[in-house]
């Protein structure tokens, strides 16, 4: 009854107006699953490859018709009649059919769309919400939202080098209250920026993109806005950064052009440590470039006991890259982006591997998103305890937050908000 009878892919648009892949899967019993695939702006060199057409006469070369054709052709032929409840078999069949180490032949966007839609169809067939189907009875921890409320770097057209400045409402008793705190601080920040004469346009992920002079300026505005909203920084909420350092690592130096700084790896570590001393920063993502292992080691040795150091470009949700980090003692947390690795099974493996090594995990969106809220369910299913899904603006971001509100409501008194404990004593 749970055999796959139809797979239909189409080209849709993401939140930046670029094409992406959406996949529908239908099972013999009539169960249906739909998934839309996200896309990143700053991408790691070691990520699985999303397939784009390259035809400049359509969408500037960013069309995904070839990936859609791969789903409707080869992948449908290979998976027709296969039991949707055997997720790992399905994912392995697609990986084998692709035949490349980075899913570049069929496209990670084609493979992931099918992988997630299959899981959703199987969940519907089982009469379970996706988070329970994937995570079982232990899926009850609501994640701390890491809310990106000031954007810089590749996500905004301003002189700030660091890509994301986030608030983590760790002091709330529930996810719903955490979301309220985030929204109140977000609106307070808008007022503070406006009062200071800054623009309040938003970047790709819904955060503000003001023309501030430095990272310190951005952090000071956020702390001020939080305290004006009645919340205490360092207690009710803490701060997080996504440095996206790979984006400005050139010829062995970290080129902070907005601040007029050119730093070697040791100086970059000192720069980040200085920010963490001055502000309640408890999470730093991609503080060093993806292949600057020596720099990562310096950063981990200096800050790893008091700050969560998240590897995004460093690990690209890939167990092989994570193993390098574990062997070398790099970072202490992994960012989980389903489209970096390209299947649900491999995503689960990456989270399991991280948790076994006492690393934390953060479920994450991409800057090019859709209304699909799968990652909200996966954050709960995999007990990540943290989720990065943008700001408190743009419906593509709010879709995930609103789904988490529904999950918390459905879990009722079984729901647990991860809170400060998820940062492991930091």
Swiss-Prot record:
Disulfide bonds: none
Subcellular location: Cytoplasm; Secreted; Cell surface
Binding site for (2R)-2-phosphoglycerate: 163, 337, 366-367, 388
Cofactor: Mg(2+)
Cross-referenced Pfam families: Enolase_C, Enolase_N
Pathway field: Carbohydrate degradation; glycolysis; pyruvate from D-glyceraldehyde 3-phosphate: step 4/5
Family annotation (PANTHER family): ENOLASE
Function: Catalyzes the reversible conversion of 2-phosphoglycerate (2-PG) into phosphoenolpyruvate (PEP). It is essential for the degradation of carbohydrates via glycolysis.
UniProt protein name: Enolase
Gene from which this protein is expressed: eno
């Amino acid at each position: 009854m749970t055999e796959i009878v139809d797979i239909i892919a189409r080209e849709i648009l993401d939140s930046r107006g670029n094409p992406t892949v959406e996949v529908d899967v239908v099972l013999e019993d009539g169960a249906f699953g739909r998934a839309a695939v996200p896309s990143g702006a700053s991408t790691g060199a070691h990520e699985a490859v999303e397939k784009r057409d390259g035809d400049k006469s359509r969408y500037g070369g960013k069309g995904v018709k070839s990936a859609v054709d791969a789903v409707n052709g080869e992948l449908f032929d290979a998976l027709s009649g296969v039991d949707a409840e055997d997720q790992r078999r399905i994912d392995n069949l697609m990986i084998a059919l692709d035949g490349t180490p980075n899913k570049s032949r069929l496209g990670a966007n084609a493979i992931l769309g099918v992988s997630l839609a299959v899981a959703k169809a199987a969940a519907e067939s089982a009469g379970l919400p996706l988070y329970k189907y994937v995570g079982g009875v232990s899926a009850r921890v609501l994640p701390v939202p890491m809310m990106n409320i000031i954007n810089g770097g590749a996500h905004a057209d301003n002189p700030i080098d660091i890509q994301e400045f986030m608030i983590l409402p760790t002091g709330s008793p529930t996810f719903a209250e955490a979301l309220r705190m985030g929204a109140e601080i977000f609106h307070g920040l808008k007022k503070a920026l406006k009062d200071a004469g800054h623009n309040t346009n938003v970047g790709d992920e819904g955060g503000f993109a003001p023309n501030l002079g430095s990272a310190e300026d951005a952090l000071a505005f956020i702390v001020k806005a939080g305290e004006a909203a009645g919340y205490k920084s360092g207690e009710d909420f803490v701060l997080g950064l996504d440095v996206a350092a790979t984006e400005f690592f050139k010829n062995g130096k970290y080129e902070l052009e907005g601040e007029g700084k050119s730093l070697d790896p040791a100086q970059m570590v000192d720069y980040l440590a200085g920010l963490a001393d001055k502000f309640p920063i408890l999470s730093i993502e991609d503080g060093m470039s993806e292949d600057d292992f020596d720099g990562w080691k310096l950063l981990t040795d200096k800050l790893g006991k008091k700050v969560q150091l998240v590897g995004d470009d460093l690990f690209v949700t890939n167990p092989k890259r994570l193993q390098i980090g574990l062997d070398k003692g790099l970072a202490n947390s992994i960012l989980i982006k389903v489209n970096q690795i390209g299947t649900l099974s491999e995503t689960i493996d990456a989270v399991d591997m991280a948790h076994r090594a006492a690393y934390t995990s953060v479920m994450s969106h991409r800057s090019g998103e859709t209304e699909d809220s799968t990652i909200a369910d996966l954050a709960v299913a995999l007990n990540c305890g943290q989720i990065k899904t943008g700001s408190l603006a743009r419906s593509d971001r709010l879709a995930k937050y609103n789904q988490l509100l529904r999950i918390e409501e459905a879990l009722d008194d079984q729901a647990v908000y991860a809170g400060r404990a998820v940062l492991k004593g930091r």
